[in-house]
Amino acid sequence: MASCTETPIEAPASIAGDDDAILGELVHLARAGGGRGLLQFESLVSAHQYRDLYPLFRAYVPKGAEVLDWGAGNGHFSYFLLRSGYSVCAFALHDEGFEAWRPKGPYRFVPGTPSDPVTLPLPDASFDAVASVGVLEHVRETGGEEAASLREIVRVLRPGGLFVCWHLPNRWSWIEAIADRLPGKHHHAYRFSVSQIDALLTAAGLERVLLRRYGFLPRNLWGRSFLRGLGQRRAVARAWDALDHVLGWGFSIACQNLAFVARKPRTDAP
């Protein structure tokens, strides 16, 4: 997967074998119908859109940390968190049944209120990290607002805690630009520039420590029936990753997604 870093960091320690195993398990669950709505995992190529997220998260958030999976959806990131030794609290407006197929580990689900989609029914300073995996860009669609959601996230983070945001649509994405013009094609209604992200983080009192662009090539199309078989091959997935990385490095401004890590200050400002 393309990894277009704007704020350089030391390469994170990778646990590639574990990551590949987790992705493989999710692909198997998607194909077997064991995981509800795992559309992103209908092929190995599409599943690899998360392959860079796993080591990135581990690099910043130590094993055993208490993590809020904010907007947990079908539970795929909670699955990774549990398999990786984190203590997980999943928040979503609707329960999609992850409890029925989740791996073992410390886990609880906290439902939200559709009439009040912003408020987190959780105590202040409850978590070492909060993860948003394809969620922040959708809050307005459910009646929320990004700035208000970020204030709630800051409230439930402990001092020094981290907000890890993945799959935030890039305002200048070529994929989104084309999808926006194709009738019936899914695209994101809200996309973000770096300056917009920084303004939101500053207003919420968060300090950005990492920003990267990634994902030049499309992924989810490999889950379609005519490509699914080919997309299950590991060699094809690795080749697509390599091409994605090269094109993403050369044309980073047009990558589909943005990711960032931001920190809540360790002490309150005087």
Task: Describe the predicted segments one by one.
Residues 1-123, 129-133, 150, 255-258, ...:
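Conserved N-terminal segment of class I S-adenosyl-L-methionine
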Residues 95, 136, 171-172:
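Alpha-helix N-cap/helix-start and coil->helix boundary motif
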